[in-house]
């Protein structure tokens, strides 16, 4: 039986009651406060009832542990108030009665670990132990030999450099902390020790010898510097000499030296090929304190009497291994013979004027070869050997890539279509992936550099420039400045022309032709990945380069880099395995 429908009267009644319920009722302020107090009282009553039950259990638990618990002292300074308000009662917090075995506040009384447990960076230099220095050297990958090697430099403030030199270094030039080669070599050089520094290009060697050199000159008798050195008979007698293998490196060193020299009122002169002798004569007319030179032009200047090294007791050879490779071994020996002997300091007044007991000779090199050892033995006195990093091993921050072309197909490998197409492809990809790119392309011959520049311009890479030995000095300087300033994005160069050039932020190095000497491969790829930056190298290689395959394999294995499959399977590397 179906249910009867609702009557009209009932329907009207429900509608009226719903309207009453839905219509808001406005209360006065006093009524709202009264209602709020009533609700809060009901909540507190419920909490109090629940707390009575919990407190009974809590007291029974506390009495079973300790009859008279000691009240916990609270540091008023630390307890500024509760950060959170939970639903339960504060009396329910059992952590207030926690009794630690040892009372200790981490925030107010840090533990005294003792000097032996502190890291070397947290200690004063006088508190450093033998173990601390060993850890310090490991941190910066510094090793040494030669006996009585002084501890490295922890920071500029702890060095013995003159205050005015430190002020220029830190405040004016912004050198916050030393590099590993600077940490290791500066303390030795400041104490007059001869040094053989083995470090790669780009490790900060320039400051490693410039700072001790300027420090030495500032220690020379002030009356000599102000008066006697200014006499016409001493105008061409430098107090320090720096030799570099190439003109570009010499100019680079000069530029950095003048940052200090100009502020210290010391004259720095460059003697390199490509400049007229009259320019050198004019440069030393007002006196010279430091000479930066290449070996060949310096010997010419010495023979012509333009320069006199009789007062030069501070001598530096930068990239000495490269000077030997370029055939300057005899020139180096001749220059060393022009320098005054240490005995002169003992037998004349020079010892008091120049404030040293022996001539100081610094030599920086990437490798130790027999000619380097010969020069060291004959001309350096009990040198300290400083090894920075793993010289000769693969650089971790350089991604080394290879393009293997198998057997050499074309007699003219420069214009090989496959190699050119691959080069264009690599350059386009790198350009698209890197907004601020800077690329160096190495070739073995001057003609190859010129042909590559022409082909690149044809394919839309007109922002390239070329340097090689046949370029005039002015043209080479102009090309390097243009590349360094970013006007040209691609530099095409031979090894000799590019050795020692410090171009920051090179993002890609392309070895369009593999070098015949494997050491040069290391120097080439070292143009990128400097100062902690990541870099990429790409090397074009074929069977015609098999004479360096074994060295390349050893180099990659030693640096824990992945060897390409073609290199592992090549006959030139397999035959060595059988012999071993």
From Swiss-Prot:
Catalyzed reactions: ATP + H2O = ADP + phosphate + H(+)
InterPro entries on file: DEAD/DEAH_box_helicase_dom, Helicase_ATP-bd, Helicase_C-like, P-loop_NTPase, RNA_helicase_DEAD_Q_motif
SMART domains: DEXDc (SM00487), HELICc (SM00490)
Residue ranges of the motif DEAD box: 318-321
UniProt GO MF annotations: ATP binding; ATP hydrolysis activity; nucleic acid binding; RNA helicase activity
Gene3D superfamilies on file: P-loop containing nucleotide triphosphate hydrolases
Annotated compartments: Cytoplasm; Nucleus
Chief location bin: cytoplasm
Keywords, alphabetical: ATP-binding, Cytoplasm, Helicase, Hydrolase, mRNA processing, mRNA splicing, Nucleotide-binding, Nucleus
Listed GO CC annotations: cytoplasm; nucleus
Domain of life: Eukaryota
EC numbers on record: 3.6.4.13
Residue sites binding ATP per the record: 199-206
One BP term from GO: mRNA processing
Motif Q motif per UniProt: ranges: 154-183
SUPFAM superfamilies: P-loop containing nucleoside triphosphate hydrolases
Role of this protein: ATP-dependent RNA helicase involved in mRNA splicing. May destabilize the U1/5'-splice site duplex to permit an effective competition for the 5'-splice site by the U6 snRNA, resulting in the switch between U1 and U6 at the 5'-splice site. May also act to unwind the U4/U6 base-pairing interaction in the U4/U6/U5 snRNP, facilitating the first covalent step of splicing.
Similarity comment: family membership: Belongs to the DEAD box helicase family. DDX23/PRP28 subfamily.
Domain note: The Q motif is unique to and characteristic of the DEAD box family of RNA helicases and controls ATP binding and hydrolysis.
Subunit structure: Component of the U5 snRNP complex.
Record-given protein name: Pre-mRNA-splicing ATP-dependent RNA helicase PRP28
Organism: Debaryomyces hansenii (strain ATCC 36239 / CBS 767 / BCRC 21394 / JCM 1990 / NBRC 0083 / IGC 2968)
């Amino acid at each position: 039986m179906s249910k009867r429908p609702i009557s009209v009267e009932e329907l009207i009644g429900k509608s009226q009651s719903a309207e009453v319920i839905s219509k808001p009722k406005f209360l006065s302020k006093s009524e709202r406060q009264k209602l709020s107090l009533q609700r809060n009282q009901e909540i507190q009553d419920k909490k109090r009832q629940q707390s009575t039950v919990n407190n009974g259990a809590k007291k029974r638990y506390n009495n079973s542990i300790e009859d008279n618990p000691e009240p916990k002292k609270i540091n008023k300074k630390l307890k500024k108030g509760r950060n959170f308000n939970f639903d339960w009662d504060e009396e329910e917090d059992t952590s207030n009665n926690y009794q630690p075995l040892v009372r200790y506040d981490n925030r107010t009384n840090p533990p005294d670990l003792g000097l032996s447990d502190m890291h070397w960076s947290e200690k004063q230099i006088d508190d450093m132990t033998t173990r601390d220095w060993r850890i310090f050297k490991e941190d910066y990958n510094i090793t040494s030999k030669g006996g009585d090697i002084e501890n490295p430099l922890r920071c500029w403030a702890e060095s013995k450099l003159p205050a005015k030199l430190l002020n220029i270094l830190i405040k004016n030039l912004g050198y916050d902390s030393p590099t590993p080669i600077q940490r290791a070599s500066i303390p030795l050089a400041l104490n007059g020790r001869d040094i053989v520094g083995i470090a790669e290009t780009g490790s900060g060697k320039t400051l490693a010898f410039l700072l001790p050199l300027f420090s030495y000159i500032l220690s020379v008798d002030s009356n000599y510097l102000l008066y006697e050195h200014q006499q016409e008979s001493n105008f061409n007698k430098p107090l320090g000499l720096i030799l570099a293998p190439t003109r570009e490196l010499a100019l680079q060193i000069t530029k950095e030296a003048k940052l200090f020299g100009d502020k210290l009122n010391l004259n720095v002169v460059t003697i390199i090929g490509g400049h007229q002798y009259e320019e050198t004569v004019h440069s030393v007319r007002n006196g010279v304190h430091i000479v930066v030179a290449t070996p060949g032009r310096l010997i010419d200047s010495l023979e012509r009497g333009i320069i006199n090294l009789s007062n030069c007791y501070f001598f530096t050879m930068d990239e000495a291994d490269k000077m030997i490779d370029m055939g300057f071994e005899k020139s180096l020996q001749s220059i060393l013979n022009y320098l005054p002997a240490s005995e002169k300091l003992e037998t004349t007044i020079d010892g008091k004027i120049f404030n040293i007991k022996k001539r100081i000779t610094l030599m920086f090199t990437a490798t130790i070869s027999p000619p380097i050892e010969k020069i060291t033995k004959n001309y350096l006195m009990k040198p300290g050997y400083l090894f920075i990093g793993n010289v000769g091993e693969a650089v971790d921050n350089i991604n080394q890539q290879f393009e293997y072309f198998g057997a050499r197909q074309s007699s003219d490998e420069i214009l090989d279509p496959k190699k050119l197409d691959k080069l264009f492809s690599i350059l386009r990809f790198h350009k698209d992936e890197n907004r601020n790119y800077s690329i160096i392309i190495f070739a073995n011959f001057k003609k190859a550099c010129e042909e590559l520049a022409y082909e690149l311009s044809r394919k839309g890479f007109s922002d390239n420039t070329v340097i090689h030995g046949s370029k005039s000095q002015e043209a080479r300087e102009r090309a390097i400045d243009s590349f360094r300033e970013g006007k040209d994005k691609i530099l095409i160069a031979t090894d000799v022309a590019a050795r020692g050039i410090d171009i920051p932020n090179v993002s890609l190095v392309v070895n369009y032709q593999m070098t015949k000497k494997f050491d040069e491969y290391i120097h080439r790829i070292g143009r990128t990945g400097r100062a902690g930056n990541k870099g990429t190298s790409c090397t074009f290689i074929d069977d015609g380069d098999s004479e360096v395959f074994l060295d390349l394999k050893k180099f990659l294995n030693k640096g824990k880099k992945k060897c390409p499959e073609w290199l592992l399977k090549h006959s030139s590397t397999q035959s060595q395995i059988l012999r071993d």
